[in-house]
Amino acid sequence: VASGLIAPWCLSRAEGSQAASTLAAVLAGEQVIALAWQPEQGCLEPDGTGLLATPQAEGSLRVSGTARFAAPASADGFLVAARLPEGLALGLLPRDRDGLVRLDEPAADGTASALLRLSDVRLAADELLARGPGAGSLLRDALDVALVASAAELVGLMDHALDLTLDYLRTRKQFGKPIGSFQALQHRAVDLWIQRQLARAAVDAAVAVLDSPGADARARTQAASSAKARAAHAALMLCNQSVQLHGAIGFTDEYELGIYLNRALSLSAWLGNAAEHRRRWGALADASGALTA
């Protein structure tokens, strides 16, 4: 869900007939466009893109470099962010463009992202969506939205995983009574409920910041990192503990809980895990003076 928001967000704010026609195709379900920019895990800022662009005649570019985690790998095209001397360039590349090599990288939840290797790939002038400082701002805003959306998805899977676990505690019997009647397990279940509520509160707070017309770019990014850090940490804790509370059945791929666990493993790492976003939040807070004694 979250990865599907980035391309429409950028396309709807870009100019030109190419952006408009591609946006219409994406909204109609005729095309899927994946963002490609991260050279490695832990790169959270658009300026850290692994793609370099060289200006050519008539406004075109030649792009080379490596980008990972373009999801989904089966996308019809890629929204690439490449570095120029004056900032970033955002452009659309079809998956079959000459010089573009794609390798699938499977994830824990059964999905796959693409590793792209670009060697002097031509990006035509009419395929450019934005360039310069505006391109960086556009991508940063899109990533903030995607982070909050991924945090919201994590909260949603926590809802289902917790409901499944509580129902199991009510029905599974041991020593002649439901195991949910044992106080030690009740305490663990309450801890999971608290983690879910904290994650939901962080997402609600981030949505409020993103919806606020007065929020600046730093506040939006800080709120997005806060939501992702909290939700990623809580989702992994809740799903891991839910497996323990279920016992042996929680380890089986056929059981529904495994779907939530594997999705939490994959989504919590996408666009940065909890630890990376805590560090990012701290750096932003420090830069703004919020941590000054």
Describe the role of every protein-language-model region:
Residues 35, 91, 118, 158, ...:
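Residue-level signal for inorganic ion chemistry
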Residues 25, 29, 55-57, 61, ...:
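Alpha-helical interface subdomain recognition
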Residues 1-20, 24, 28, 70-77:
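Internal helix-loop-helix
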Residues 22-24, 41, 50-53, 66-71, ...:
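A generic local secondary-structure boundary/capping motif
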Residues 29-31, 47-49, 73-76, 87, ...:
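A generic structural signal for well-ordered coil/turn residues at beta-strand boundaries
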Residues 29-40:
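A short, Trp-centered hydrophobic/proline-enriched beta-strand micro-motif
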Residues 60, 64-101:
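A short core secondary-structure module
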Residues 69-70, 93-131:
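Flexible, small-/acidic-enriched active-site or ligand-binding loops
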